[in-house]
Swiss-Prot record:
It comes from Cochliobolus lunatus (Filamentous fungus). PROSITE patterns: CITRATE_SYNTHASE. This is Citrate synthase-like protein clz17. It is an enzyme of class 2 (transferase). GO terms for cellular component: mitochondrial matrix. Citrate synthase-like protein; part of the gene cluster that mediates the biosynthesis of squalestatin S1 (SQS1, also known as zaragozic acid A), a heavily oxidized fungal polyketide that offers potent cholesterol lowering activity by targeting squalene synthase (SS). SQS1 is composed of a 2,8-dioxobicyclic[3.2.1]octane-3,4,5-tricarboxyclic acid core that is connected to two lipophilic polyketide arms.
Length: 423
């Protein structure tokens, strides 16, 4: 007779377990029919799994719509050809499509409805009513800052935003036509080498950041400054212009523009970059986030984790999709070539970057916000000859059964490239 081996309770005969399940269900129905007997919402849920290899049934606890891998590993069966050895069940899930490596309250996405929230705040509200600095504060500490907190936060970033001479020197030694990501990572690595605390943390027995939230928060804030300052240094090197020192009293984006010498009297450019940055600030367990967390599990410093995340984000199926999407439009060449290109995509000869998403089964909510930015920069974007190609692709893909049936919709990358170029 088969038995039940579960994460909770002792093994039972199948017949007893089924009878028990029926009784519990009947009792719940009876209770629901009596107004004076509330049905407890704390009753645990279980996933009942029948293992045909052993004829055992396992009951796995279900909490908030997920099961724990450690509970699944209680399921085991004899190794073929070696009946004395048991092998625990493992889960193969390429791409983490159905797997979460940790619980988080940072970002929530409903891919069916097209909803995105940071710490419970709608992306649309952050986009329209807040700037990137406030969004960073929200992501880091779980709440939007007061005015005084925001000023203090920006001051701490400013204090770390002057690049050391060695950072400037190493970037300036690179040819100006060097790949951007290569220059960016080189500069950040040098910046990290100049941060004595981060460098020391990898060579001492007492963990600098483990269970030390103040040190961790301080290091993360320095990372914000390092990223902005390195971007400015790389930009100035490539363009052959002077790098200006940071200025107190400016936001992160405003200081970046100040450092590269860009005049922005009406703040139109800084506000656009702010909102583009809010759009891309976080997206649950993305490839780069997973890479960051893998490295962080070794208890290394935040910048080492960030370098790994940036490397992951540079790929064409992640952050690099923005550039590849634009190059794809250049490859098409003209509106007349769009039907042939769409046909090639459906024949799986080409990938249509900017369309479809692993999470969203309707329009990416960030895409609608990007269109708002396009409207603000309409004149500059309309002058781009590739825009009409993009519009025609969007029109055809929106009505073609191939895309409609597969729920392939516009994502944030498709039109985002036009806004960056317009700036």
């Amino acid at each position: 007779m088969a038995t039940v081996n579960g994460a909770v309770g002792k093994p039972q005969h199948i017949s007893k377990m089924i009878e028990s399940t029926k009784m519990n269900g009947n009792q719940a129905q009876d209770a629901a029919g009596r107004a004076d007997t509330p049905v407890s919402s704390d009753t645990p849920d279980y996933l009942h799994v029948f293992d045909s290899r052993t004829c055992n049934i396992h009951h796995i606890p279900v909490s908030d719509g997920f099961v724990r891998g450690s509970d699944l590993s209680t399921i085991a069966a004899p190794v073929k050809g070696n009946s004395g050895r048991m092998q625990k069940l493992a889960v193969l899930d390429p791409g983490f499509q159905h797997t979460a490596c940790k619980e988080s309250g940072i970002t929530f996405i409903d891919g069916e409805k097209g909803e995105l929230r940071y710490r419970g705040v709608r992306i649309e509200d952050l986009f329209h009513d807040h700037d990137f600095d406030s969004t960073l504060h929200l992501l880091l500490w779980g709440r939007l800052p007061t005015n005084d907190e925001k000023i203090a936060f920006e001051r701490r970033i400013f204090e770390a935003a002057t690049p050391p001479q060695e950072v400037c020197d190493v970037i300036r030694k690179l040819p100006k036509n060097t790949d951007f990501i290569s220059m960016f990572l080189t500069g950040l690595s040098t910046y990290m080498g100049a941060d004595e605390e981060m460098t020391r943390s990898r060579h001492q027995a007492v963990m600098t950041y483990h269970k030390n939230m103040k040190a961790t928060d301080d290091a993360i804030i320095r990372c914000f400054a390092y990223v902005s300052a390195t971007l400015a240094t790389v930009y100035c090197h490539v363009k052959g212009v002077e790098l200006h020192p940071p200025k107190e009293g400016l936001t992160l984006v405003e200081n970046f523009l100040h450092m590269i010498g860009m005049e922005d009297p009406d703040k139109k450019v800084s506000r656009t970059i702010d909102r583009l940055s809010i759009n891309m600030a976080d997206h649950e367990l993305s490839c780069s986030t997973a890479a960051f967390l893998h490295v962080a599990s070794s208890l290394t410093d935040p910048m080492t984790c960030l370098l790994t995340a940036i490397s992951a984000a540079s790929g064409p199926l992640h952050g690099g999709a923005l550039e590849v999407c634009y190059q794809g439009l250049e490859l098409i060449g003209s509106v007349e070539n769009v039907p042939a290109y769409i046909a090639a995509v459906k024949a799986k000869k080409f990938r249509l970057f900017g369309y479809g998403h692993r999470v969203y089964k309707t329009q990416d909510p960030r895409a609608a916000l990007t269109k708002e930015l396009m409207e603000e920069h309409r004149e500059a974007i309309a002058a781009n000859p590739l825009l009409q190609i993009a519009v025609e692709i969007d029109r055809q893909a929106n009505t073609d059964p191939y895309f409609v049936e597969r729920k392939l919709k516009l994502n944030a990358d498709f039109y985002g490239c036009f806004v960056y170029i317009a700036l």
